[in-house]
């Protein structure tokens, strides 16, 4: 079951091009779901990133219930733990939904199969996923609208954009680029493509993503390919929680620059994969780590 859940999560962060936009006083997601662009008083949220954004901009009072995650907690941990949970990221207890009488339900694409059932019950539903950093910025703005915290949201969006532009400016001065990948699993060795949040993070950090040259939305990196590309670093996320898993996945790993220089590490999936404002701070941390690799 754990492998199935993480595989679904991987699809969520790679295959999809989910976006959310405001147009003609309506909020529209990539699936054609539309809601009025206004403040909602009673919101059920299954997207961890949106929950984190709501707390950051002071819109948490609009939350009546959430869907909790199974693998990692949602920030701020102590406050989110006190919220009522009526399901998880992929499924909601419909009887509980009726009980809380929401005027808006915000879900991720992992709940797509259940959206129609919820809509038939007469509820406003929107899919909130972002698959890029720009998408996260847009999500911050939309979250501000639905929670009545538009000013606070735009302030947060600007702060995140400043951080992103600072990173881009610093990277533009570099004369060379590191090569690497963020891995989802080691059996087989699957990496995040460019069309994903982790892939977009690498791009903005000025890293050459070795998975970009492998066809498909879920690039499988063969031992021969890894040896040929000779990455400067390899990072793990999702189902990976130890560098040892990566090192022992193939006998070619120790032969790469990443293996020889011990540049194999694990990233916090709740930060690097989640469509939350916190990813921009995590990029700063990752940038410093990559700078140390460059200066070795």
Feature map (PLM): residue ranges:
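His/Asp/Glu-enriched short active-site or ligand-binding loop at hydrolase and phosphoryl-transfer sites
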Residues: 74-75, 197-218, 266
